[in-house]
Amino acid sequence: MAISGFKGTLKLKPLKTPVFYKRDKDFRGYFSGHLQHKETKLSPAQLEAFRNAYNFFTKDRTGCIDSHGLMSTVAKLGMNLNAYDIYNELKCADRDRDGKINFSDFIDVLTDKKLFLKAVVPEKRICLDLANNPGILLFEILSKFVEISALHRKDIIELVSYFRKKFQESNSEILWSPYGRRAFKTDICSPPRSSTAAFANSARISIMKERDLYKFLEALKRCNLRTDSPYSKIPVFPLFPDVDGVVLGKPFKDTQKLEMLRKREPLSFFEDYFFNKRDWKTQAMNVKPLKSASGYSDDILAIDQLFKKKQHWTVSDAVALKQHVKRATDTYHLGIALDHRKEMLNLWKKIRGDLVGLESNNESFYNTFSTYTWSWNVCQELLSAKDLRLHDANVNKTSPSNSGLSSPSDLSESDPETGRKRKRKSSRGFRQ
């Protein structure tokens, strides 16, 4: 009886049909609230990066950004805004309502998720323009700083990584945001009107799935780029200069053996190895003197006789003649090099090169003079520093009067001013 009485008094309420739009609304509010709690705080490095970006603005005496400082910063970056737009931006960014933007207001605006989504993914019916879309000016100025590299590299990396992470965290919230309705039907053919939107598009592409990326590339291929766009032109330069245009030929025989023999050759001087010089002077010593009255060498005269004897030439004859021509050309170049070498030695004697280094207390004059004796006939210097020192040593042995340790009287004859100075110094020392 008790149980039946209990059943009679217990009445269940009828079930109600679920209202889907209310459930979606509640879920949407829960989802946005969950993301707000997920918001992370700024690290010390990120806070320092924002501080350095804040210091780039023109500020007043109190260290805050007023309307004049904001307009001056905008003008420096090449952005056009009138006083009314500046007032709206200042009013939107002034959180404590003191008429200025301090660092706390600056951080609150740039870390605000709604303003960030408004700057990155604007609403479809709102044109992405600074004049008609207040609240995104600080994002645009910050992106300009990154674009022109006004900040240090460390600060740029911190800011970009912060906003990239913020965009990835807000990617799911864009589904419920009124500014996210345009995200899935973006006009990729028209360039973005904002640098912040361009950075956001790059970040969006970096987190795309493979299927979405293929769709994006297919849509990008269907776009007709402008004819004056540099991206529509085919580059004429190699993209990989070390790889493109390199034709691998057939390797020579015994190349490794020759390389090992070359490395085993003894080196008398480091400069010979460094400049890869040839011993052209020994070759020039073997050159026969000119015996003909015409002034030409025997090799050139022999080639002239060959041309007179034969009127019809074959390929094999031309190959054989090539060696004679090369020998005659080398002989001619060596003869010119020897003549220039004599001229340079005469110039060294005239300027008394052995005394220039002593007078200036600079022994590198040998190397300097040797550099200016470069000859394209032998592709190296005609006189090395070693040759000049050997020449001075031979001259000093044969004629003591021309040595570097010559007497003050000899120096006074060759250079009167230098001799007078030395005589004055010696007389002063004698008086002391």
Swiss-Prot record:
Domain of life per record: Eukaryota
Modified residues (Phosphotyrosine): Y273
Gene3D superfamilies: EF-hand (1.10.238.10)
Signal peptide: none
Biased composition (Basic residues): 420-432
GO molecular function, a single term: calcium ion binding
Binding site for Ca(2+): D94, D96, D98, K100, D105
Annotated keywords: Calcium, Metal-binding, Phosphoprotein, Repeat
Keyword Calcium on entry: yes
Biased composition (Low complexity): 399-411
InterPro entries: EF-hand-dom_pair, EF_Hand_1_Ca_BS, EF_hand_dom
Occurrences of domain EF-hand (ranges): 45-80, 81-116
Pfam family, one: EF-hand_8
Chain intervals for the UniProt region annotation (Disordered): 394-432
Family matches, as PROSITE patterns: EF_HAND_1, EF_HAND_2
UniProt name for this protein: EF-hand calcium-binding domain-containing protein 3
Organism: Rattus norvegicus
